[in-house]
Amino acid sequence: MATVQKSQHSHFFLLVGCIVHLSNFCSTTTAQFDYFKLVLQWPNSYCSLKTTHCPRTRLPSQFTIHGLWPDNKSWPLSNCRDTSADVLKITDKGLIQDLAVHWPDLTRRQRKVPGQKFWVTQWKKHGACALPMYSFNDYFVKALELKKRNNVLDMLSRKSLTPGDQRVDVSDVNGAITKVTGGIAILKCPEGYLTEVIICFDPSGFPVIDCPGPFPCKDDPLEFQVLSRRKFQDL
């Protein structure tokens, strides 16, 4: 009986210690995550939104990366503490050029030598949640790998869903993606534009899994533009 009471007292003081010193007593040094969300955006739709300004004369003619987000099914992950000793700078010139093509900042003018602040911000907000499984550099390599392995524009074109004046149905877009990946994707369609496609993966990046939702797009026809209706100017 005395042993049981002693154990209960120990748990009580541990709980009190956690409450008083939560930041350094009970916190884990690394974030755990259940799955990856690869968020891809269609540039013409994204740059057509009323709240978006894209100062580029030419937009990419492919889906580009918005982000690679580690996440949990029980609670959302973001702004995880970076406990690594990595210097937050990409030194591989080939990787930088690859990111400039596949993960550009559409709200900034295109440059011959891309700045890295945009990608570092993505790491701090989302990528660090993938530690310790993925380092700073590995995180961007994985994002590019998943994006190249899942060509959404090609998936849609196989079902004759191509950018243009004709609208596309949400169910048709979902069906075309599931047909190839085997998983249920999430679509984002603000202002009636097919703007984002989110594909979910096991933490290793394989296989594709069903995204847990929510699924914000109603089953209404969406605009999938080949040319933006907004005017762009190179600043």
Swiss-Prot record:
Entry-linked InterPro entries: Ribonuclease_T2_eukaryotic, RNase_T2-like, RNase_T2-like_sf, RNase_T2_His_AS_1, RNase_T2_His_AS_2
Range of residues in the leader sequence: 1-31
CDD domains assigned to the protein according to its UniProt record, in alphabetical order: RNase_T2_euk
A single Gene Ontology CC term: extracellular region
Binding site for RNA: Q41, H66, D105, L106, R108, F118, K125, H126
Chief location bin: secreted
Record: glycosylation sites: N72
Catalytic activity: a ribonucleotidyl-ribonucleotide-RNA + H2O = a 3'-end 3'-phospho-ribonucleotide-RNA + a 5'-end dephospho-ribonucleoside-RNA + H(+)
Gene3D superfamilies associated with the record: Ribonuclease T2-like
Disulfide bridge partners, by residue number: C47-C54, C80-C129, C189-C217, C200-C211
Record bears the keyword Protein transport: no
SUPFAM superfamilies: Ribonuclease Rh-like
Subcellular location as annotated: Secreted, Extracellular space
Keywords noted in UniProt: Disulfide bond, Endonuclease, Glycoprotein, Hydrolase, Lyase, Nuclease, Secreted, Signal
GO molecular function, one term: RNA binding
Active-site feature positions: H66 (proton donor), Q122, H126 (proton acceptor)
Keyword Amino-acid biosynthesis among record annotations: no
Pfam families xref list: Ribonuclease_T2 (PF00445)
A GO biological process held by the record: RNA catabolic process
PANTHER family linked: RIBONUCLEASE 3, RIBONUCLEASE T2
Role: Self-incompatibility (SI) is the inherited ability of a flowering plant to prevent self-fertilization by discriminating between self and non-self pollen during pollination. In many species, self-incompatibility is controlled by the single, multiallelic locus S.
Family note: Belongs to the RNase T2 family.
Name assigned to this protein: Ribonuclease S-2
Organism: Antirrhinum hispanicum
